[in-house]
Amino acid sequence: MAIPHPSSLIPPGASRREDLRLVTGAGRYTSDWNLPGQLHAAFMRADRAHAEIVRIDASKALAHPGVKAVLTGDDARAAGFKSLPNAISSPGKNGQPMVKPHYPVLASGRVRFVGEPVAMVVADTAAAAEDARDLVEVEYRDLPAAASFDAAVAPGAAQLHAEVPGNLAFEYESGDAQAVAAAFARAKHTSKLTMDSQRLIGNMLEPRACLVAYEPSSGSYSFHVPLQGVGGMRGQLAAVSGLDKGKIVIATQDVGGSFGVRGPAYPEYFAAMLAAKQLGRPVKWVGTRGESFMSDFQGRALSLTGEIALDADGKFLAIRFDDRADLGAYGAAFGSFIATRNLTVTIGGVYRVPALYARTRLAYTNTAPVSAYRGAGRPDIAYAIERLVDYAAHEHGFDPIELRRKNFIPRDAMPYKTPNAGTYDSGDFEAVMDDALKRADWKGFPKRQAQAQRAGRLRGIGIATYLEAGGGGAAPKDEVAVTFEATGAMTLYAVTHSSGQGHETVFPQIVAAVLGIDAASIRFHPRPPAAELVGNGTGGSRGALGTGSAFHVLGNKLIELARPHAAAKLGVPESGLGYSKGKFHAGRRSIGFIELARALAGTRPHPLDTTAEGVYGTSYPNGCHIAEVEIDPETGAAAIARYTAVDDLGHVINPVLVEGQVHGGVVQGAGQVFGEQAVYDPDTGQLLTGSFMDYVMPRAGWLREIEVHDHPVPTPTNTLGAKGVGESGCSGSLPALVNATIDALRPLGITHLDMPYTPARVWAAIKSVNRDS
């Protein structure tokens, strides 16, 4: 029988079941957990960007009351820890591999960025550990710092790693350089623009922390740690420590924000493992906000120079990019992958472009390592493409809307194979744009602009027709499991972990919708009951299309698994048994699924306990975002006047969760456009934006008027037809808001500014053109 799609069965207003627990303070984050006899850790961190470690004197710290140990890089090296992981696997230019210098648990011989952990103090109390940390004395021999890509690759620059001459880690190519060059040679119009996607700091609500206990009889460790997925974190901890994954048990419950920053295993976690083993007691570390600013892996840090070639009618002939990526001091986790594969997978955007090419150079600098931040490269390339298209339209006299329309990949061309070997599964880009134009009242903008002008404000409108790649993951498949209780209630399991996405709500809803039962009888737990499940964590906009699709398969499997038991209970052959609305039925006789599960509970393991799996590839969420921005020319202050988002996310399972994800992504994009930037002193490498006094976060009042609408074109790549939503808001908002801001400034002669558009930067640009005129 046909099983109704879950999206047709979940009530439109279905709320998040975890919210009441979290907003009333009943959540349990890593810092809320304690173990008997636990010790507390504090880290002494580098106060300079680049220096040799001449000597570490921990004698005063060790003499401080309550201190149990002070560990340094020598101790970590003696313990045999391997380098922290780096995910890059793609070959570089001419097949050259990336140079990956050792990333130590604690600095050994040299410090390479402000905030790098140098020593760990372990004491009876957190206060004692923090006091003793300040007593650790380190003698340094200062070295010149290179705090940016340009400084790092300049002739004579200070070398961060002996094995990386010139600090250039890698050069990556994608596409056909010769075909692109030929297209540019015959083009009627060309445009070129350099766009910076500045370095950002994740600033999750919950700072990083860990609680580690060692069990000597089994040689195993138990962890409480903020993460994005049990499988990924366990794999990294095992790889660096040299342990079997079965020796690492993770018991995390709630996680307060992630944005990609939680995915990697950090040095502090391994140092805590070492201390817990050596001292025979659990070790707890809770980072401060200042430590997060300095030592959390950061995001973006890209500069993209884009060029586009057009014929006389405005048809795109080729696009090419020359990109520069700042990796920070080490190749951390996903940083190099983001700047290469992730940055180029959607290089053509939503457009039919015959020839594509990108070159990316990656350099080590004396700054915090760079890894994933919401979107992980895809918002950067979406911003660059949409900004470049808008720039070319105005430079060569094309209407920005019609130029896009002329070059869209049509719906009937799907699946569409791109010139750089990607395949877009589905989409209707023109229809999505037309939907957005109507909802945003694009034609009514001149009236609103005139009203703003009469009030002394500059008003602009910007559009972005973005494309995202959702569903990336390192695991070969997504496995899920279910167990049943005596009451017939069930618990779902997967290794993905929520940091605000609503897993406790949506995964039970999917299974309940397939079974036709109340979701209240189902709960979700992000850890398997016994055997390890294989699967991807929360990241890459994968939750619904990967884990969610596996739960959809599980729901259907449960019906078939229960069928012979239902037939036996009803005394009918399986062939005569139907299933609908949560019940098996044969004629007038029926038995409910929960009733059947309850009746089978006497057998252990429960006959319906089972697993399901699926292999789900990439899908391509897309959409059209339209923003209107007003600027006060006297102060340079910009305000978002209207915002309309129309997104093709495939089948929408829970509209409430989707709207929240889009809102959050748009606000994070607004943060990057109008305020956020991690700034390092170019001479010393000191972090100048190390607190909320200096680092501008988005404000609630920035986005008062936002409309979110769905325009679903289901994907065939997974059983739910879902495309993913977590990072789409960032990918759409960056170019839409930038294009709107530049549109407001264009009458003054300003055609481009780099982000962030702070009042000071916008005001300076306005004054500059006023002086020139």
Located regions from the model:
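Short glycine-rich loop/turn motifs
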Residues: 108, 206-211, 303, 460, ...
